[in-house]
Curated annotation (Swiss-Prot):
Keyword field contains Zinc: no
CC terms in the record's Gene Ontology section: ATF4-CREB1 transcription factor complex; nucleus
Keyword Signal: no
Name of the featured protein: Cyclic AMP-responsive element-binding protein 1
Gene name for this UniProt entry: CREB1
Family: Belongs to the bZIP family.
Disulfide bonds: none
Cross-link (Glycyl lysine isopeptide (Lys-Gly) (interchain with G-Cter in SUMO1)) at residue(s): K269, K288
Chain positions with Phosphoserine modification: S117, S126, S255
Region (Basic motif): 268-293
Length: 325
């Protein structure tokens, strides 16, 4: 671009100089004659202007630059136009559609290959095995998993009377007595008590206490009858602490309650399974009947086609025999 600007400036200067020289030549009284015109090819280039030699009548030689300039390259450049190929998008869509069609055809072939043939269905119908597998009865949760029963060992409470005797009440209702001065094992005396059922609050519960000699004594439930080794019978009253005074570290354990109606739940589930089996068997029989009817219709059509073909064959044979005769 800088070289083009310089060429344009030199051309303008040459035109100005030529115009001034022409005006000078016209001012002379005599018209100048063209004596010699030389255009040296060796020095002429695309960038240098053409030089003309003009000889005046007085013998003076003047160099005149040519007015016609060679075509210079244009400084203005044409903007570049960017073309976008839309065919590539169309090709990508076509390729995607072709891939989808190939995938659909593969899936269709797989589905057709998985369909059972008429021979296989006919064999299934002729066999005695049921077409629909029966739903096996599941074992109820009550039968499979038995409830876990936790055994909790409760420590035996021991009471000491004012006379120094120890009283231990076991779970079975037996009362063991031991004196303070005797051995714990040899001095034990057992009283068997039969507990009565709980009644309304405010009533006194009586229970039998059996001594070592076989005698039975009727005493209230909150009293203990103790017979000493000497034969004296003493009565002690047991006071139970209220539930609110239980120590915070005591844990009350209770066994889990068994299900109240396991048999009814199992029977209901069994009825539901049997009903589902009956519905499945009914549907299977209906489908078998429809398929057999379809096969019978197809057999009838094939028999008619076979009869028609046999008749056409006979007609062709008769026609061939007549032509041969």
């Amino acid at each position: 671009m800088e070289s083009g600007a310089e060429n344009q400036q030199s051309g303008d200067a040459a035109v100005t100089e030529a115009e001034s020289q022409q005006m000078t030549v016209q001012a002379q009284p005599q018209i100048a004659t063209l004596a010699q015109v030389s255009m040296p090819a060796a020095h002429a280039t695309s960038s240098a202007p053409t030089v003309t030699l003009v000889q005046l009548p007085n013998g003076q030689t003047v160099q005149v630059h040519g007015v016609i300039q060679a075509a210079q390259p244009s400084v203005i450049q044409s903007p570049q136009v960017q073309t976008v190929q839309i065919s590539t998008i169309a090709e990508s869509e076509d390729s995607q559609e072709s891939v989808d069609s190939v995938t659909d055809s593969q899936k269709r072939r797989e589905i057709l290959s998985r369909r059972p043939s008429y021979r296989k269905i006919l064999n299934d119908l002729s066999s005695d095995a049921p077409g629909v597998p029966r739903i096996e009865e599941e074992k109820s949760e009550e039968e499979t998993s038995a409830p876990a029963i936790t055994t909790v060992t409760v420590p035996t409470p021991i009471y000491q009377t004012s006379s120094g005797q120890y009283i231990a009440i076991t779970q079975g209702g037996a009362i063991q007595l031991a004196n303070n001065g005797t051995d714990g094992v040899q001095g034990l005396q057992t009283l068997t008590m039969t507990n009565a059922a709980a009644t309304q609050p405010g009533t006194t519960i009586l229970q039998y206490a059996q001594t070592t000699d076989g005698q039975q004594i009727l005493v209230p439930s909150n009293q203990v009858v103790v017979q000493a080794a000497s034969g004296d019978v003493q009565t002690y009253q047991i006071r139970t602490a209220p539930t609110s005074t239980i120590a915070p570290g005591v844990v009350m354990a209770s066994s889990p309650a068994l299900p109240t109606q396991p048999a009814e739940e199992a029977a209901r589930k069994r009825e539901v399974r049997l009903m589902k089996n009956r519905e499945a068997a009914r549907e299977c029989r209906r489908k078998k009947k429809e398929y057999v009817k379809c096969l019978e219709n197809r057999v009838a059509v094939l028999e008619n086609q076979n009869k028609t073909l046999i008749e056409e064959l006979k007609a062709l044979k008769d026609l061939y025999c007549h032509k041969s005769d």
